[in-house]
Amino acid sequence: EYRRQRQMCIRDRNMPLAYHHHMGTIIETEEDTSRLIENTKDTVKLLVDTGHMLFAQGDSIKLVENFYDRIIHVHCKDIRKDILEQSLKNDATFRQAFLDGAFTVPGDGCIDYIPFLNALKKKNYSGWLVVEAEQDPAKANPFEYAKIGFNYLSKTAKQCGFEIIN
């Protein structure tokens, strides 16, 4: 009954439902995400998270190319490559990798956002690009890192032809 009520609420308000692939959940990898999208109705949309996709050793650009019509939201998160590699080598849990500082904001990690943003622009994406990073605030000042991420993503998105509205 609860599920039916939520579905009606979403439908009545014309709110799209987006699935967020995420480490530590049932849908983590590029393959998991593809299977989900291929086996659900078009009403189920997709939130692409660049950091979680790279952590799962997947390709966010392929998600854009294959499922653009389902993408309605993007989380731009970066990865500290050395910590990710160490976490994978040690078969660390997602939680441990997070605590070790694997994630950071765009511009402070190893993701080259130009090809990703160009893929979105090529498909005329006009939704949100959200700066995000799961970090320990005692190690990474949230305000300072938010500025780093916003400045980098704004500059890079403009280079790729996006109009930035803040």
Per-segment meaning from a language model:
Residues 49:
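Active-site glycine-centered loops adjacent to acidic/histidine catalytic or metal-binding residues
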Residues 30-44, 54-166:
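Histidine-acidic metal/acid-base catalytic patches
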Residues 13-40:
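Basic- and aromatic-lined ligand-binding clefts that recognize polyanionic substrates
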Residues 9, 24, 79:
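Alpha-helical and His/Cys-centered functional microenvironments
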Residues 1-10:
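Single conserved hydrophobic/aromatic residue that forms the stacking wall/gate
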Residues 14-17, 45-46, 54:
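Short N-terminal helix-initiation segments at or just after the protein's N-terminus
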Residues 3-4, 18-24, 103-104:
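Surface-exposed cleft-lining segments at the edges of enzyme active sites
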Residues 25, 53-54:
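Catalytic P-loop NTPase motifs of RecA-like helicase/translocase cores
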